[in-house]
C-alpha cells in the first residue's frame, strides 16, 4: 500500500520561495497552510502589496497566515491546527522558535541558496558574486535554532559565470531549489536522507544588502567594481554620481587603463571607461533618474560625458 503524500506547510515570501511552493503543489503534496510576511507598501503609489507567495497560495485556495512573529501561542496554534508532517521554509524572513521547529513530525526543512556553511544569512547570492566565487548552489537542510546552521540533507553545486548577475543566478537557483525540495519531500518518509552536520570550517556570513554599499568605490580594483555591479543587479543597483547626478550602473567589465580613480578615460558608443584603483572598467549600460536602462551609446546622446570628468568618490 502506497503511503499518503506528506502534508506540507510552507513558509516563504519572495519569488524564490514561490517557485518552490509551485513545484510542491505541482508534485501533488497537500499544502494546508502558507505562512508569509505581512503585505508591504510597494510601487510608486506605495500601496500595500501581497508577497508572491501569498498571491500563489490564494490562487490555489490555500489558507494564508501573515504573522509579524511566530513567538506567540496564537501563531503556533494556527500551525498546529493544520497538523503538518513537515514545514518547508524558503526566504521567509522570520525566526522560527524551538516550539515551531519541533511541531511537525519531520521538523522544518530550509531551502538555502548557497553551499553551506559558506554564505549563511540573508543575501547569499549577492555575496557569492561580490566575493568572486566560481560556484554556489542549493542546500536543503534540517533547521535548528541557529542562523542556517542545521544539518544538511541535500546539496547541489552550480557554476557562477563571468557575466552572471544576482538576478540571473537567482532564477537558476530558484528553479534548482524547487526541484530539490520536491525530491527531498519524496525521500523524507523513508529515512533515506542522511543529515550531515555542517563543517566547522569555511563558514561565512552573507549580511543583508544595504543601499549605501551599492555606491561604487572607485578606489577598488577593476574586477571588484565589475563584480559589485553584477552583484547589485537588479537590487539595489550599483550607483555612481557624476556632476551630482546619481546614475545606476547595470553592466561593467574590466579593461586596460589607468588614471586617478573615478576619472573618465574614454566615453564613446562602446562605453564609458573609468579608472579604478587598479586598471579600469567599461560602463556599458547606465540609467539616469526617471529614465530607463540604456546602452552606453544611447545614454551618451542624452547625457554627454567627456574624458577627464570625474565621478564623485564614495563616502567613507
UniProtKB/Swiss-Prot annotation:
EC number: 2.1.2.9
Residues engaged in binding (6S)-5,6,7,8-tetrahydrofolate: 114-117
CDD domains hit by this protein: FMT_core_Met-tRNA-FMT_N, Met_tRNA_FMT_C
Catalytic activity field: L-methionyl-tRNA(fMet) + (6R)-10-formyltetrahydrofolate = N-formyl-L-methionyl-tRNA(fMet) + (6S)-5,6,7,8-tetrahydrofolate + H(+)
Top-rank EC class of the record's enzyme: transferase
A Pfam family it matches: Formyl_trans_C
Entry keyword Protein biosynthesis: yes
Key words, A-Z: Protein biosynthesis, Transferase
Membrane recorded as keyword: no
GO molecular function: methionyl-tRNA formyltransferase activity
PROSITE patterns per the UniProt record, alphabetical: GART
GO cellular component terms attached to this protein's record: cytosol
Superkingdom of origin organism: Bacteria
Stored PANTHER family: METHIONYL-TRNA FORMYLTRANSFERASE (PTHR11138), METHIONYL-TRNA FORMYLTRANSFERASE, MITOCHONDRIAL (PTHR11138:SF5)
Family, per entry: Belongs to the Fmt family.
Cited function: Attaches a formyl group to the free amino group of methionyl-tRNA(fMet). The formyl group appears to play a dual role in the initiator identity of N-formylmethionyl-tRNA by promoting its recognition by IF2 and preventing the misappropriation of this tRNA by the elongation apparatus.
Record-given protein name: Methionyl-tRNA formyltransferase
Gene (UniProt): fmt
Amino acid at each position: 500500500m502506497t503511503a499518503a503524500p506528506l502534508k506540507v506547510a510552507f513558509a516563504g515570501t519572495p519569488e524564490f520561495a514561490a517557485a518552490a511552493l509551485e513545484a510542491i503543489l505541482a508534485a501533488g503534496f497537500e499544502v494546508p497552510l502558507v505562512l508569509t510576511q505581512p503585505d508591504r507598501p510597494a510601487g510608486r503609489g506605495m500601496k500595500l502589496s501581497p508577497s508572491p507567495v501569498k498571491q500563489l497560495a490564494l490562487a490555489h485556495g490555500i489558507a494564508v497566515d501573515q504573522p509579524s512573529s511566530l513567538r506567540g501561542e496564537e501563531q503556533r496554534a494556527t500551525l498546529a491546527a493544520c497538523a503538518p508532517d513537515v514545514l518547508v521554509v524558503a526566504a521567509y524572513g522570520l525566526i522560527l522558535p524551538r516550539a515551531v521547529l519541533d511541531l511537525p513530525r519531520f521538523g522544518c526543512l530550509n531551502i538555502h541558496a548557497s553551499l553551506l556553511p559558506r554564505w549563511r544569512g540573508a543575501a547569499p547570492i549577492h555575496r557569492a558574486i561580490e566575493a568572486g566565487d566560481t560556484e554556489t548552489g542549493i542546500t536543503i537542510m534540517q533547521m535548528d535554532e541557529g542562523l542556517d546552521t542545521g544539518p544538511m540533507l541535500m546539496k547541489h553545486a552550480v557554476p557562477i559565470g563571468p557575466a552572471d548577475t544576482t538576478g540571473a543566478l537567482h532564477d537558476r537557483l530558484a528553479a534548482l531549489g524547487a526541484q530539490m525540495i520536491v525530491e527531498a519531500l519524496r525521500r523524507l518518509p523513508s529515512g533515506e536522507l542522511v543529515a550531515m552536520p555542517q563543517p566547522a570550517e569555511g563558514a561565512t556570513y552573507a549580511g543583508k544588502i544595504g543601499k549605501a554599499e551599492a555606491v561604487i568605490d572607485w578606489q577598488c580594483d577593476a574586477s571588484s567594481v565589475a563584480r559589485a555591479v553584477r552583484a547589485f543587479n537588479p537590487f539595489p543597483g550599483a550607483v555612481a554620481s557624476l556632476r551630482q547626478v546619481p546614475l545606476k550602473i547595470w553592466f561593467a567589465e574590466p579593461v586596460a587603463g589607468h588614471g586617478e580613480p573615478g576619472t573618465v578615460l574614454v566615453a564613446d558608443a562602446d562605453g564609458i571607461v573609468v579608472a579604478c584603483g587598479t586598471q579600469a572598467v567599461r560602463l556599458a549600460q547606465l540609467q539616469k533618474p526617471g529614465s530607463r536602462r540604456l546602452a552606453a551609446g544611447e545614454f551618451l546622446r542624452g547625457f554627454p560625458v567627456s574624458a577627464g570628468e570625474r565621478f564623485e568618490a564614495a563616502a567613507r
